[in-house]
Amino acid sequence: MNKGVKFRIYPNKSQQSLINQTLGCCRLIYNKGLAMRKDSFDNGLKIGYKETSAMLTGLKKDNEYFFLKDADSIALQQSLRDLDSAFKRFFKKLGGYPNFKSKHNHNQSYRTINQGDNIRISGKYIKLPKLGYVKFKQSMDIGHINNVTVERTSTNKYFVVLNVDFEPAALPFTSKVIGIDVGLKEFYKATSGDSVTNPKYLEKSSKKLAHEQRKLSHMIESHISGYKTIGNKRFPICDKPLSECKNIQKQRKKVALIHEKITNQRNDFLQKESTKLIRENQIISIEDLNVSGLLQNHKLAKSISSVSWSKFFTMLEYKAKWYGRIITKAPTFYPSSQMCSCCGYKNTDVKDLKIRKWICPECGTVHDRDFNAAVNILNKGLALV
């Protein structure tokens, strides 16, 4: 079994320059391969990885592209393999048509393969192709490294994601089973009686984020107009490209740091909650939510996107696979909130999200909306085991 582990690396200036150059080269090769396949497709011809790989070989011999020799050759080939995989997913209707990669995307990455032990850990350093030994922060022991993805974030931090061999040990058997109903106010309510409040990290940082984003927008608008207004006076500003304006780039980094903090807080929360549920329960029953459909509700879309249900469910699923637990899913349109968990009566009035408590007209049971839904989800899940 394989898993990905992420560590921060601290390349020196020459290593940073080479990483950035490799990112640019991989993007160039990917885009050239995509353009070649697109043109062939438009002309009724079908080409694949073999033809684009031959194109790369030709470019390396061209003096105009001499800089390709400085980049990791395996990473260049891998960018074409990734392109080929993207086309295969497209033709199987598992994804959209591949898009060209932009140098303006602030998060960039490339992937390289471990061949002949050219990727290995030595003390506080990791050896990477072309880069040599790069200082990194290892926080856990890992198995054999299969491949590595080198990432540069929007805040100019560098990371490696190592795909490693992993042999998980199954957790001790427990008789505990649990059903959970996810929500926006409470992240989830469980049949155990536990409820976890939605931390709302985005909402808590929204005021500061909006302020810094407005500040960045004003700086960009002033730069484009060529003038900066102070009071009643207008002052000319530099005519450098945006990428060379240090103050604008500093402000962009401020905005990116806020986004990064929100992402890190959310990921930490999701990891801890998913691990807790996996450790304590043998069977976990969840809803098979159509999140993309729920996002069509524009009033709730921002909150639904922020709460990250899909990511949480994904974590539960792969951790259950690792540690010998069982995840069951109630069907997408199962009316878990409307059904009485005691007698099975379906109360369509409960479709109204404002109704948080209700009394079953059939058996008289008083229900908390979310707890009742969690019980129904568990019962449905157990029936599917």
Regions found by a protein language model. Name each.
Residues 1-385:
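Nucleic-acid substrate recognition interfaces
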